[in-house]
Amino acid sequence: MALSKKRFIIAAVLMIIITAAAVLISFMSAPYLVMYVSDTNTRYITQKAEDGLMFSVEFIHSVNQTPVKDTYIIENEQIRAYSTTYRSFGAGVQTALDDGQTMTYDDDGNMVITGFDITYNPLRYIVGTVSDHILTIDDKEISLRDLCGRNAKVVFEITTPFEILTKGLL
């Protein structure tokens, strides 16, 4: 009788360990969108990378000195270019449409190009020294200059909690 009880306890403990391991593996492999500074590995944003999640980065273009807004969408654990919005043609901005792209105008008269077939992982920006880069995610506007500093090398990446730990992202 004592042997049977001991086997039952061992079996129960093993089941708990196996269940905990399965939950941990599931959690550790779930995709997350992270934003960090590559020079310091300081992580500022960690958000579940669910399909349809959108974010944008808006800045003043360094050459033509007008606002540009790049919008991205998460699809199939990838960061995909969704649209680019800008006010005027000029050096450094797209002047012709590629196959599958369309251009419309928003309510403010800005040009909006959609239909991109470009994915990034990682997506990189260098925060401006003169003008800021504004991240919009979950209807929140975040100054990347205030958050990360001027000239910060910002990286957006789809990764897992396990990879976050192994890369040393603080």
Describe the predicted segments one by one.
Residues 37-39, 59-61, 158-160:
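Short, structured patches in soluble enzyme cores that scaffold and shape functional sites
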Residues 1-7:
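Short, Lys/Arg-rich N-terminal segment immediately upstream of the first membrane anchor
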Residues 56-96:
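Extracytoplasmic/periplasmic/luminal assembly and interaction segments
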Residues 10-27:
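Hydrophobic membrane-insertion alpha-helices, especially the h-region
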Residues 36-54:
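Short extracytoplasmic/periplasmic juxtamembrane "stem" segments immediately C-terminal to an N-terminal membrane anchor
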Residues 22-39:
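Aromatic-capped interface at the extracytoplasmic side
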Residues 93-170:
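Mature, soluble, non-transmembrane domains
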